[in-house]
From Swiss-Prot:
Residues 357-360 are annotated as: G4. Belongs to the TRAFAC class translation factor GTPase superfamily. Classic translation factor GTPase family. IF-2 subfamily. HAMAP family: IF_2_B (MF_00100_B). This is Translation initiation factor IF-2, chloroplastic. Keywords: Chloroplast, GTP-binding, Initiation factor, Nucleotide-binding, Plastid, Protein biosynthesis. Residues 253-260 are annotated as: G1. It is found in: Plastid, Chloroplast. GTP binds at residues 253-260, 303-307, 357-360. GO terms for cellular component: chloroplast.
Amino acid sequence: MRYSNVIDFSICMSIKSENTFLLENPKFIKNLKFFNIHSSQEPKSPTDIRNSVENSDFNVQLENKLKNSFKQDGKQKSKKKKILSVDLDQEHIFKKKNKSKVIISAPDDLTNNSEGSFKSGKQKKKEKGKHKQNVNKDIHHTKNNRLSNLDPLDDINKDKSVIIDSSLSIEELSIKLKIPPAEIITGLFLKGISVTVNQIIDIAIATQVAQKYNFTVINQNQNNQSELDQSDKLQQVSTITSINRAPIVTILGHVDHGKTTLLDAIRNTNAAGKEIGGITQSIKAYEVNWPYNSSNQKLIFIDTPGHEAFSSMRLRCAQITDIVILIIAADDGLKPQTIEAINYISSKKTPFIVAINKIDKANLNLIRVREELATYNIISTDWGGEIQFIEISALQKRNISQLLTAICSLAEFINLKADPTELVQGSILEAYLDKTKGIVVNIIVLSGTLHIGDIIVSGHSYGRVKKIINSLGNELIQAGPSSILEVLGFYSIPQTGRYFQVVNSEKEAKKMIAQIPLSGITQTTKNILNLNPKVYNHNLNTRSLNLIIKADTQGTIDAIINSFIQISQKKIKLNILTASLGVVSNTDLDLAFSTQALIIAFNINISTNILNAAEKLNLSLRKFVLIYDLVDYVTYSMLDLVDPEYDKILIGQAEVQTTFTINKGTVAGCIVKSGKLKKDALIGVYRKNKLIYEGVINSLKRMKNDVNEVVIGNECGILSKDYHFWQSEDLIKAYELHEKAKTL
């Protein structure tokens, strides 16, 4: 018996489809890796094998049939060979379990019944006709798959449906769609939406992700378009009564790159100097008039927070903006929120201007900033690109007029229109509860004219407009398109970021609200962390920190939640009991007392009565005005609940010389061999290199005197209350415990 160095195809080619494969792939034989196979036959060369296969009656007949099939389908056999040879290097040889034959298979064959499935003779005869018709279709389909950029999961999930009826996290969406979270995150990032695996996204974004993978999203209100669809609709106004409207300009960029300072320079104010902590924590909108082409051009500016916690606020503003000012600090370059803005601008194809700020600083490398932007295909006009770059100093108000003129020029080019005669549509920038005014809603009118007495609807909230106040603080009777307004009259607090519209009557408003399913309401932050057990409840024994959040605006609550989601919760789970607008009430105190929760008040005042009541109940009630401080406080509170861990540090060794007994127990008379021994130190006793006891030095004496420590070369007596079995020559190792830095 001997071993040959070629495959015995009389064994491995046991069914006809393998012969077909070899006939149509002559290069495959040459590329085979030959293994030592137990055989009694004479060795055959690759040429002999190929000739044997090609000249078989079956393959001669099959070749003729394939030629005819190719002619019917308008294909040539040579084209088929070319296509099939693409993946020769990807073919795999494997042995089928419990079988004495080698099966040759390509990845595409594993799911292709006509080319790679193994069937009985009867089944083969039944499908022989089908095989002839489908050969070219399968080959053509394979080619298209290789050339297309569609996700390979598209075909798997084709024609499937998924229920998305509420906001959910990326991880929950991944489970629903059976798509890796990293893939969803990458896809959203390319669209300018930065998210993490634990971050909550609304129905509109989740629906877009599902539809990308050919899912049919069900159980939503079919009468309402997605937020993005509505946005597109609002911008596309062209009627006989249309007029030019002012552009909505949003300033985007990294925290502390000068967004608010730029607006101060434009408005001749000092809002940046008045901001707590020097950062913007809410959306601010302003109207500015600038002389352009012999007339005053009205510009609407929106200032957005740059801190990462306020990503949802930035997204809301970017959805309604016409022109983006991408501001970049010349001394800092591109940063995470800058890149987030670039990705969003790119995905939405929003017109934009680059403002390179802080050129008043010394030793700047402006070329470096331009080169960084060029990597994102943002090239200035003086470098041969299409984007206007304006170098400014917001602090010194340099080149501000040049920037404003560039904005007016771009607005003129994109030719924005709105119809003031139609029913009002717009977007809610912010909503909050004021102690004296009641429910206050900041809006921007995108089309139509808003009047006192109009019935206004947004999501599940509606009301009758009682008061309209413009950005200058003046009361108005009506306001047209591209107006920043403060509106009073809503009966309940609407969801920020939602679109609103005016309807003809309260009856119509109630009818619209009734058509919206309760599950379709956009993200409710109350109990948001608790609604995601898949994300947070990894360990049922994990300790929890209960929180009650009270804030001034819905946007602030969203930012707080986003910040908390970024905190690791492997050891301690955040449990948000309530998150609502308004002042701290006695009801909040009662809930905190029964659940031992921390009460957090952000940007709201706390009455003296509430403070006194909280103190009597020994409750933790803290007020914050900076999100940095709030996140630090919650993080430290979580760390307090983490059990301490220690490092054992060897501080000395001693050897037992003798032992004697006293009333309190057995004393070991020792001599310190290295380092020192300390009272209350942790010790380990070793006998013949084997650990026999671990405990604590309860008493340490030298010359009958109690001491706190004994250093090298000195004799001492050691007493451990729970150990009495000392022996001469026992080795004692003394340790100090150093607490490790706690982590979450």
